[in-house]
């Protein structure tokens, strides 16, 4: 018996429950066996092999203790991104790279692109390999948010869309279904449940019929390539649509219950620092916009983009890094409590960026360090997520924010600490322009726990009933304040069973519940 197998069995037999206990048992075993102390990655791999061979019983707590890169599941779920095949896009955007053999707007060298290329852009293989990788690192994969990226999703053939999504579900289900509907039904109780599904598309492709189709696929969030909300800047950059399409798409999506993410691009041709700052103020001042999430991608100057010629002829000049950091600080200080900045900057290899601050790939890290040094705070959801800072002793408070958005009313409910620096759980409730009630999001943050966790040092807001309490409050608001008799939820396929236990029933693609008097 080698040192790895011996150590794993010793850890299980002693019932190790804490990081300190893990380290102590490892040292003790290696000293007794006269071997150097094994690393956690090797131990985790050996543990999985022993479980597979049925030499040891599954011990979830040990998986957590041996977990590598814990940040991957500190938001309460795990994210998996899959890339579509290269396909034309109707857009002719000035800044967009046009690399052969790659979905438009993406470039070789980006991690997701390289993984997809190695697997021939196969959705099943991409989903399967990422799931296996997360499991091998000790992360639970029973709650997955799947993100489909690459080009303009709505422009791909419908047959390809159906096949692509079905194969993602097949990979999570561990079996091949006859059709998409069957694959979704299987996923409701599968080991790896897709509780959220998002796609990228253009605002001018969002129509009532497209929304119905997106729901049939199981989508719960749409990433809109907005980039700018100013007509002249959209026109200069050859976006092919205007502000009215952005406003309409946002309204249609929110009324249908979708979470709406705006991809925004500071430093576009035609803009400047003052305009960019003003734009982010307008995003949350004007009810026509009010996105739930943001991805802020400073314009990257790439040789394969038409913008390259502008730069060569000195018609375009990127911001300096110092200018961008100052701008980003101003933006972050203006973000409301109900918005999550999902990402800042792309994973584009720095050698491909010819000039400008987009060469810096760790912009968010720079901003976080600046925030800490200067003593200011960003109110966005990501900066306030509880992550691994949870303490059972700290008192949790219910907060509520009402705001107008897209001809409707949004009610943002959240459980936070008193100073609102730690966010535990949130719910987005909407009264639509047609006076209907829909829950657009429920999310509890903190270390992701399996659906049937073991007790031990693993303390997390998960499985504490916070989500259920928020749902109960949302139902009370709908019934007592808004006088509505029915509430619906835009549930991910893998989350349907959760809502069934709360009295909700599947109606078309939504979970619905009648509120009795």
Question: Could you say what each language-model-derived stretch is?
Answer:
Residues 1-126, 130-175, 337:
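Flexible, acidic/Gly-rich N-terminal and inter-domain linker regions that tether
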Residues 41, 45-77, 187, 191-193, ...:
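Flexible inter-domain linker/hinge segments
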Residues 108-126, 146, 150-261, 265-322, ...:
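Conserved non-cysteine loop/helix-boundary elements of the Radical SAM core domain that shape
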Residues 298-339, 346-387, 451, 457-461:
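Radical SAM enzyme [4Fe-4S]-AdoMet core and its adjacent flexible, acidic
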Residues 395, 400-447:
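A conserved beta-strand-loop-helix scaffold within acyl/acetyltransferase catalytic domains
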Residues 456-477:
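Conserved acetyl-CoA-binding loop-helix of GNAT-fold acetyltransferases
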Residues 476-491:
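Conserved GNAT acetyl-CoA-binding A-motif
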Residues 491-510:
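Conserved active-site alpha-helix within GNAT-family acetyltransferase domains
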């Amino acid at each position: 018996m080698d040192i790895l197998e011996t150590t794993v069995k010793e850890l299980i037999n002693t019932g190790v429950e804490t990081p300190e206990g893990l380290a102590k048992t490892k040292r003790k075993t290696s000293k007794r066996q006269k071997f150097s102390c094994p690393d956690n990655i090797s131990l985790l791999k050996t543990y999985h092999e022993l479980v597979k061979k049925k030499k040891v019983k599954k011990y979830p707590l040990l998986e957590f203790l041996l977990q590598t890169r814990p940040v991957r599941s500190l938001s309460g779920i795990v994210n998996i991104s899959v890339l579509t095949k290269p396909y034309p896009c109707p857009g002719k955007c000035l800044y967009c790279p046009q690399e052969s053999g790659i979905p438009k707007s993406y470039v070789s060298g980006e991690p997701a692109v390289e993984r997809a290329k190695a697997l021939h852009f196969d959705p099943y293989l991409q989903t399967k390999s990422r799931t296996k990788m997360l499991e091998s690192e000790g992360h639970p994969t029973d709650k997955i948010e799947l993100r489909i990226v690459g080009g303009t999703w709505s422009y791909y053939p419908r047959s390809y869309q159906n096949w692509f999504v079905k194969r993602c579900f097949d990979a999570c289900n561990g079996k091949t279904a006859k059709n998409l509907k069957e694959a979704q039904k299987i996923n409701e109780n599968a080991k790896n449940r897709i509780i959220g599904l998002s796609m990228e598309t253009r605002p001018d492709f969002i129509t009532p019929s497209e929304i119905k189709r997106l729901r049939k696929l199981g989508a719960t969030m749409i990433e809109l390539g907005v980039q700018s909300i100013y007509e002249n800047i959209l026109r200069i950059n050859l976006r092919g649509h205007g502000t009215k399409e952005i406003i309409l798409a946002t309204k249609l999506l929110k009324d249908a219950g979708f979470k709406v993410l705006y991809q925004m691009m500071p430093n576009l041709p035609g803009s400047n620092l003052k305009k960019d700052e003003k734009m982010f103020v307008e995003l949350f001042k004007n009810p026509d916009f009010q996105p739930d999430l943001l991805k802020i991608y400073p314009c990257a100057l790439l040789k394969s983009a038409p913008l390259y010629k502008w730069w060569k002829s000195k018609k375009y000049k990127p911001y300096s890094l110092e200018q961008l950091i100052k701008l980003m600080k101003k933006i972050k200080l203006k973000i409301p409590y109900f918005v999550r900045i999902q990402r800042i900057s792309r994973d584009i290899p720095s050698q491909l960026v010819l000039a400008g601050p987009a060469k810096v790939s760790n912009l968010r890290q720079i901003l976080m360090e600046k925030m800490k040094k200067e003593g200011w705070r960003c109110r966005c959801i990501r900066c306030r997520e509880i992550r691994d800072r949870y303490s059972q002793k700290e008192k949790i408070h219910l907060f509520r924010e009402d705001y107008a958005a897209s001809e409707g009313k949004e009610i943002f409910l959240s459980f936070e600490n008193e100073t609102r620096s730690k966010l535990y759980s949130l719910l987005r409730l909407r009264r639509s322009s047609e006076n209907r009630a829909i829950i657009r999001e429920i999310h509890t943050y903190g270390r992701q726990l399996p659906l049937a966790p073991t007790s031990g040092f693993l303390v997390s807001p998960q499985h504490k009933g916070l989500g259920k309490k928020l749902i109960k409050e949302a139902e009370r608001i709908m019934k007592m304040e808004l006088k509505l008799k029915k509430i619906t939820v835009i549930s991910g396929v893998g989350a349907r069973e959760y809502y069934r236990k709360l009295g909700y029933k599947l109606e078309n693609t939504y979970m619905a519940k009648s509120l009795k008097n």
